[in-house]
């Protein structure tokens, strides 16, 4: 194979990757705009939780922050003093930086794999936060990886701090295949503006990349790694999404 052909193949691959990311991003924005995953309700609960628990200035680390648009809204009129966001996407972090300005707090943005960086930050005694937060991301990991992340998060928290997890969660007696079919059934029934092509993208993504745990499994992990308490603060009407708090 000539070097020219190799270069052309790499360029074609990069173009296809960017095109695929663009399609996924557009679909995600449609999901957010139409509130198909209930972001408005759950981030309202997040806002109320932060107002209730933090009447003094607090710091937050968000893992996989994306453009932080919903987090920014949840932080309005709270005592947030410093926000740190980690994401693999440079364009998303640039938007997150712009979005976070409205909160008037110090903003720090780190490019990289949030799970790997969580491990590295946990080894630094100077890196401690009042709140660590992640939304619709942890379920992409296998159970052993989830446990490692939650253990590292526990080490990142100041005494009295807590880890807030927004994510999809399986019902207690539901296996993964049943969860996938139930979730996709809800998508087909309720996500009325999704095209057949977009539904196929959702099907491919969920079937290949979603590995949600049950609430009891997450509670067991929280106890195993040393959290003192665990609470389900919110559960959506479809029983697919929860907001969980792990208290240090």
Which residue ranges define each predicted feature?
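N-terminal, positively charged/glycine-rich alpha-helical extensions of SAM-dependent methyltransferases
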Residues: 1-27
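A short glycine-rich, Lys/Arg-flanked "PGG" loop and its adjoining helix->strand segment in the class I
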Residues: 147-159
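Class I SAM-dependent methyltransferase SAM/SAH-binding core
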Residues: 61, 69-71, 75-117
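Conserved S-adenosyl-L-methionine
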Residues: 64
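Core SAM-dependent methyltransferase catalytic element
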Residues: 226-248
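Conserved alpha-helix/loop element of class I SAM-dependent methyltransferases that forms part
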Residues: 38-56
